[in-house]
Every structure is written in structure tokens, then in C-alpha cells.
Amino acid sequence: MNRRHFLSMLPMSALPSLSAAEFLSQKRTFIGREKFDAVVRLALAGNWRAQPMGQRVALFGQALRGTRYVAWTLEIDDRVESPSVNFNGLDCWTFFETALGLARMIATPQPSYSPSDLLRQIEWTRYRGGVCRGGYLDRIHYLDEWFTDNAARGNIKYITGKIGPVTRMTGRTNDEMSLEPKIYRYLRASPALIPALNQIERRLEKVPFHYIRKEQVAACEGRIQSGDIIGIVTHRQHVFCSHVGLALHTADGACRFMHASLTAKRVIVDKPLHEYLAGIQAHAGIVVARPV
């Protein structure tokens, strides 16, 4: 009996933390090897490892500029969950997460870097407690929980309250996924997961959530650093955050929003953050986290 056969016979709860290849082939979980290699070469040639963490995140974010926007890049199977990266197409979540994963990866000096090295970093930040056991609910699906979980494990500092005055979110639910399960590939295939997902959502709603109103962001931009993770808080019902990207201070002195843009259909460095927020009525404000 080989190791893969043995692992397949174990209950999910008995599985240790494994690389993505143990759940799905890297032919499915790692797309764009040539671009990965090119970005890593650029980072090594520029000695990006010597930069502070936030600056490294910003550099990798800029290296991903122009990558086309592709929605649902996290939904790669009907039933099996596995850490994944797609350098040929990014959505807002996978953009910031890939830049962060690359920045974390090169912090450890190695002669070379492989897809497995990045996938391990993705697993560490994408999944609750840093562990994927092959189940859909191992993954963190709401950005507010991503901030809480990763801050608790020392991957980021949640600094919204230090950046500017905050307002507490009230009168809102955080249940978008359980209300609309048919738009999620895994939930369509496994509707039995919905009650457990709803329990997670109910738990998240009990966690106090504070944000900076968009009208106050312009006065706060000087305290935001390049590479900070910017969660966009929405006025929409049933979810707190609807978008995410990275801050980037550019040569003109502006604090700009770098993100995978559905409108532009690619990764871009957008307007100054406060202008970007003002231009979209549904945006209510921001939350901020700093990679460490």
C-alpha cells in the first residue's frame, strides 16, 4: 500500500497538514509556473528579501500588475479543497494572498523555490489555523475572519484602530454564502455543508467589527504603509467586506489602491485610496492589516 492510498483511507480528521499535491495534482492547483519562476528570479536579483515585510508584499504586488482578472479562482473542485495558486488569473482575494505568500516564502533563504514552497505559505494564511485537511470549510471564506485568524497567529497586525477613528458595524448579518449557496461550486455539490457554514457565520457576527468610514480615509492615508492589506467595507447587506487589495505609496506621494479590478479586468494600481472609495457608492470604508 503506497502513502497516497493509505492517506485516502484515513478520515479527514486524521490527516496531517499536507502540501496541496496530497489532495489534488499540482496540474490543477498551481497554474502559471513560468510566471512564478520569472517573479522569483526578479525578487532574487533585486534582493527583495532584504526589504521590510510590507515593502516585499508591495513589490510582489507590483510584479503581478497586468495579470488578468478571473473570478472564482479559489473554486477548483466540486468536493476536494486544496491550497492553490493561479498566476494566469487573479481575483481580489488571490491577488493579495499571492503577494503575501511570495513575500513570506522568500524570507527563508533557499537555493531555489518550488510551487510547493509557495503553496505551503498559501495554506498557512488561507485556512483556519493554518491547516487544510481537504475540506471546504477548512478555508476562511470571510475577510473579517481572515484578519482575526491571521492576527491571532502573528501573520499580520490588525491596525485599523491605530490608523484612524473607527465606527462599529451594527444591524448587519454576515451570511451571504449560506443565503446564496448555489453560486459556490463546492456548496452546490455538497449542500450538507451549509448548516455548518451557517454556524461559522453566526459565530463571526458575534465578533465586534470596526472600520474607518470612507469620508475619513484621506486624513488617515499618511499612516498607511505600502504593503498594508486594505479590506473594503461595504454597505451591502449580508457581508461586511466586499473587496480587498494592497496599499502602495507612489512617487507622486499618493497612497494608492493596488488590486485585481473587475472593472479594469486586470491587476492595477488605481486612484488614491480615498478617491477610489468615493467613486463607488456601495463602499462604506476600510479595515487595515499590516503583514509581519
Describe the predicted segments one by one.
Residues H5-E22:
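N-terminal export signals
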Residues R33, A50, G54, A58, ...:
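Solvent-exposed, acidic/flexible segments
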Residues L42-A50, R79-G89, T234:
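Second-shell loop/turn segments in exported
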Residues V70-R202, H259:
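Acidic/His-rich structured neighborhood in mature extracellular/periplasmic domains
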Residues I200-C220:
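Mixed-charge, Lys/Arg-rich low-complexity intrinsically disordered regions
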Residues I230-V288:
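C-terminal soluble interaction/assembly domains
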